[in-house]
Amino acid sequence: ILNAGISMWARFDNITDISLFHKINEINYQGSVNCVYASIDELKKNNGQIVAITTAQALMGFPNASAYSASKHALHGFLETLQMELGSTISVSNVYLGWIKGTNLRANALGPNGEKIGDSHHKHSSRAIDIDSCTTKIVQGIEKNKKTIYIPSFLRFIPFAKLFFRKWLFRKINKVTSEEES
């Protein structure tokens, strides 16, 4: 299970320490690549399963999260490639999450200076899912060997909405993130 992650909350034009891109990519993408690389022979030998706990931001960009979204896009592309290359010997599952209560991901997110922002941005909690409910759904999906798991389930519409209702989707996401900034 690939579950490493560090987030950010800063507009790209407000970033004062560009090294936060390297830091986020090193954890979110390269850390997962390193884990898969170290275990690939064993996974192939035992018809193993790779499960990536990721985010809806792997499917599209998101305001205030340029480095985070980019790192999750990279991970998504890497795992999709593995599925094509090794699909007969290993299984790859992606779990796309929305906001989850109780993870401290937001408190540990990096701000424009590359430092943790702390508890200053938690307005999304009314939209967030309980961590126990989330883990139950993840386990159920893994047991069923699902290739894609969306939590909450409405996230499954993102690829469709991005393709056919792009402007509407971008306006909706911009509205949600601007509410958090105020």
Predicted regions and their residues:
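A short helix-coil junction within the Rossmann-fold of NAD(P)-dependent oxidoreductases
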Residues: A38-N47
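Active-site-adjacent segment of SDR/Rossmann-fold oxidoreductases
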Residues: M60, T81-S91
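Hydrophobic structural elements of the Rossmann-like NAD(P)H-binding subdomain
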Residues: I1, V51, V92-V95
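Conserved mid-core segment of classical short-chain dehydrogenase/reductases
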Residues: S7-H22, N64
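Active-site helix of classical SDR
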Residues: V36, S71
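Residue(s) in the substrate-gating loop at a strand-loop-helix junction
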Residues: T55
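SDR active-site lid
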Residues: G87-S153
